[in-house]
From Swiss-Prot:
This is Inner centromere protein SLI15. Residues 550-560 have a biased composition (Basic and acidic residues). The modification Phosphoserine is found at S268, S489. Component of the CPC complex at least composed of IPL1, BIR1 and SLI15. Residues 365-390, 405-444, 455-474, 535-560 are annotated as: Disordered. One of its GO terms (molecular function) is protein kinase activator activity. Component of the chromosomal passenger complex (CPC), a complex that acts as a key regulator of mitosis. Stimulates IPL1 kinase activity and facilitates its association with the mitotic spindle. Has a role in attaching the kinetochores to the microtubules and ensuring that sister kinetochores connect to opposite poles. The keyword Magnesium does not apply. One of its GO terms (biological process) is positive regulation of mitotic cell cycle spindle assembly checkpoint. Signal peptide: none annotated. It is found in: Nucleus; Cytoplasm, Cytoskeleton, Spindle; Chromosome, Centromere, Kinetochore. It comes from Saccharomyces cerevisiae (strain ATCC 204508 / S288c). Its main location: nucleus.
């Protein structure tokens, strides 16, 4: 059991350098810092509460006057112009300075009951809250000034600006910035100055008591925790209802009930501020905290509305055409499911900004505008002329139809003058459409460049254009239009020519005239000649290759025959010379055994095709000897070995002793080099070798 207890103890004991011990020590350190911060915050909160109660008791000693609570009800604020403001006996500065010193890690401002009192109306307040407020807040009625309704508006604005991302506040600030010349930041600063001046005048004795009190200095929590907590606290702030980055200009509306302007303070608030802030460290701290808070928490919308830029001026002047959001485009709950995508531009709409920028660079005198361009919400008229195929076709078709009608009219009038009768009033109003029905479709005729006949097309013509066409169509203008049409579309045939006029009523032009038979024959002949020449050329090439192959084979046969005959003759001569001292019997046997006869099949096995065709019974040539050469072998029946006379041991020894000093080159001469191609004319390796390219004979 001892070993088990030791093992358990080892498991529980921490090794000094292990990862577990490091992580646990880090956790302990982290817990220490967080616990210390929470303790410090608790102590600070208690000390601030104690200090606030002491200051409040001191103020009661200084002032023995009766205080009353004056609350604002929503009914009185709407109907009456004069509103009583409650006095804040130094609570604003004290609460702000102490709350800034006692901020916890989350950095969320702690609003006491006295702060809620000045914002929430009496009718909307709960009973418990009012009782708690009555305990801690007593106000002087004798010193309460009388202010108009706009001062109430300023306080409401202050309460709204406590949340910088409020959509109602942003809307209100934008409206006020467009109505009045002053920016909302300037009005806010002015209101703060008046407020501070009043409070400084009233809180002189409190500030003297505060000078004696020592300010508690505490190291603030780390910045990472502040940033994280601030991010988490601002996570669920509702987004604005409208696009905040676009300032829309709203013209001032004349209301029936005119609101009087805020009266300026008789005494300068800046002078009061200078007098009081010379020897007041508490107010300096309050001001520093106010300025720091205002710079950090100042709204993006306030900053943008106070400092107008060139891009905002351009957006206001343009009227904000393309970026229109519906009321439900940005959801207040923050869910992306209800977001509506922006309306994209139509495909045919041009980029107007690019065209306006390039207007001075590419300026053309003769501008051709599009007649059938879609006039959507996002499309504007382009200052740069653009050639569109459809519009060009329509314009050319219309103009051609007008010219055709004019020619018809002039021709008809000339025929009438010839006959002597009065001409009928024929006008080109046949093409025109009534002004009441501009959507009617009219058939125009234009001449196709491929075929000679006229083809009807449909084109919509506006009534205003038809009036101009009917009134201002003169021969001079028609000529000018014809010239411009020829420049624009040179492929279109000229209608004024007699050939085109004839082809209008000529029925056979609808049919395609076939070329004559002779031309077809010539074409066919050329094609066939081409084909035949190709076939003939290939046949000739094949025949030429065959002939060359046969020639090569015949040359090889001749060379082989020469080589075999030369070798046979050479062998015979050498044998005769070497075997001169031998007996005739021995020489005859050697000749029989070693002679290479050319009358058998093996001599011509590589040159002659000895295959027999089935069914082809042809008499064999008598000259060819198909018999194989005789090879003398020992009979199997004989037990002893029969050897030639020169092969017997005593005779052989004599011959070897005699021939040991003989040089073979003196007898045989120089030995020629051995070529395998000469011995084997068609080996298998020759097939794998690349063929030599034979030059073509021209």
């Amino acid at each position: 059991m001892d070993w088990a207890i030791k093992a358990a103890r080892k498991k529980t004991q921490r090794k000094p350098g292990s990862t577990r011990s490091i992580i646990e020590t880090l956790d302990d350190l982290n817990n220490l810092t967080t616990d210390a911060h929470s303790e410090i915050n608790q102590r600070l909160y208690e000390s601030s509460e104690w200090l606030r109660n002491n200051v409040y008791m001191n103020t009661l000693k200084y002032e023995d006057k009766k205080m009353e609570e004056s609350l604002i009800s929503p009914e009185n604020t709407h109907n009456k112009m004069d509103v009583e403001f409650p006095k804040m006996k130094g609570e604003y500065e004290l609460s702000n300075s102490q709350n800034d010193a006692a901020k916890d890690v989350t950095k969320t401002p702690r609003n006491g009951l006295h702060n809620d009192k000045s914002i929430t109306p009496k009718s909307l307040r709960r009973k418990e809250v009012t009782e708690g407020m009555n305990r801690f807040s007593i106000h002087d009625t004798n010193k309460s000034p009388v202010e108009p309704l706009n001062s109430v508006k300023v306080d409401a604005n202050e309460s709204e600006k406590s949340s910088p991302w409020s959509p109602y506040k942003v809307e209100k600030v934008l409206r006020e910035s467009s109505k009045t010349s002053e920016s909302p930041i300037n009005t806010k600063r002015f209101d703060n100055q008046t407020w501070a001046a009043k409070e400084e005048m009233e809180n002189e004795p409190i500030l003297q008591a505060l000078k004696k009190a020592e300010s508690v200095k505490v190291k603030p929590p780390p910045n990472s925790g502040i940033a994280r907590s601030q991010r988490r606290s601002n996570m669920f702030v509702p987004l604005p209802n409208k696009d905040p980055l676009i300032i829309q200009h709203i013209p001032p509306t004349k209301s029936s009930g005119s609101i009087p302007k805020v009266r300026t303070v008789k005494e300068s608030p800046i002078a009061f501020k200078k007098k009081s802030t010379i020897n007041s460290p508490a107010i300096r701290a309050v001001e520093n905290s106010d300025t720091a808070g205002s710079t950090k928490a100042s709204s993006v919308f306030d900053r943008l509305s106070s400092i107008p830029t060139k891009s905002f001026e351009n957006k206001i002047s343009r009227g904000n055409v393309g970026h229109k959001y519906s009321s439900s485009s940005i959801d207040l709950t923050g869910s992306p499911m209800k977001k509506v995508s922006q309306k994209f531009k139509s495909i045919n709409s041009t980029d107007t900004d690019m065209q306006e920028a390039l207007r001075d660079i590419f300026s053309v005198k003769n501008k051709i505008t599009k007649n059938n361009s879609p006039k959507g919400k996002n499309s504007r008229k382009s200052s740069i002329p653009r050639f569109d195929k459809t519009s060009l076709k329509l314009t050319t078709h219309k103009k051609l139809a007008i010219i055709a009608e004019q020619k018809k009219k002039s021709k008809h009038s000339s025929d009438v003058h010839k006959t002597g009768s009065r001409p009928h009033s024929i006008s080109p109003t046949k093409i025109s459409v009534d002004s009441s029905s501009p959507s009617k479709e009219v058939k125009n005729y234009y001449q196709s460049p491929v075929r000679g006949y006229l083809r009807p097309t449909k084109a919509s013509i506006s009534p205003n254009k038809n009036k101009n066409l009917t009134t201002s169509q003169t021969p001079h203008r028609l000529k000018i239009k014809e010239k411009t049409l020829r420049k624009l579309s040179p492929n279109i045939a000229d209608i004024s020519k007699p050939e085109s006029r004839k082809s209008k009523n000529y029925r056979l032009t609808n049919l395609q005239l076939l070329p004559p038979a002779e031309a077809e024959r010539d074409d066919l002949k050329k094609k066939f000649d081409k084909r035949l020449s190709g076939i003939m050329r290939s046949q000739q090439e094949h025949h030429r290759r065959k002939q060359e192959k046969q020639k090569r084979m015949s040359h090889l046969e001749q060379d082989l025959k020469k080589q075999t005959s030369f070798s046979n003759d050479y062998k015979d001569i050498r044998l005769k010379e070497s075997l001169a001292p031998f007996d005739n019997h021995v020489r005859d046997t050697i000749n029989k055994n070693t002679a290479f006869s050319t009358d058998n099949i093996l001599a011509t096995i590589n040159t002659v095709d000895h295959r027999e065709i089935i069914g082809n019974v042809t008499p064999k040539i008598a000259s060819v000897n198909d018999s194989l050469p005789e090879i003398n072998t020992d009979s199997e029946d004989e037990a002893s070995v029969t050897l030639a006379a020169w092969a017997k041991s005593p005779y052989l020894q004599e011959q070897l002793i005699r021939q040991q000093d003989i040089n073979p080159q003196t007898i045989f001469g120089p030995i020629p080099p051995l070529h395998t191609d000469e011995i084997f004319p068609n080996p298998r390796l020759n097939r794998l070798k690349p063929r030599q390219i034979v030059p073509k004979r021209s």
